[in-house]
C-alpha cells in the first residue's frame, strides 16, 4: 500500500472516529444474549410446548430476530441454555415487547425455578449464509 493511500485511509478513520461513525457501526452490531434456566421437572413438557411456540413465532414474524437456539445440558434435561441473536438493540427491545414473548412469560413464570441472563459482546460470529 503506498503512502498516499495509507494517509487517505488514516484520514477517513480519523474522521469516522471524531464524527462518531465508528461508534455508530458498533451500535449496529448484533446483540447476543445467553440465558440459563432451570425448569420444574413436573412442568417440563408444558414448558417445552410454550417455548417452542414462542421461539417459532419470534423467528417467523420478527425480522430482527436472527436466531434463537435452546439446548439442555446432557444428563440434566431441565437445565436449559438459550442462545439468542438479534440484529441490534432495537430488535431485542421489540422482541421483549412482542405479544408472543409476553404470552410466553405469563405462561412459564411458575415453571422456571431459576434464571440467569448473560449479556455478551460479540467477538466473532460466523455462519454459513445461503
Describe these PLM feature segments.
Residues 4-10, 21-32, 69-78, 105-130:
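Glycine-rich beta-strand-turn "strand-cap" elements at beta-sheet edges
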Residues 14-17:
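Repetitive helical segments and hydrophobic/amphipathic motifs
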Residues 26-27, 53-67, 85-119:
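An amphipathic, aromatic/His-enriched active-site/gating alpha helix that lines ligand/cofactor pockets
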Residues 31-61:
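N-terminal targeting signals for Sec/Tat export/insertion, comprising classic cleavable signal peptides
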Residues 40-43, 76, 88:
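Acidic/polar helix N-cap motif
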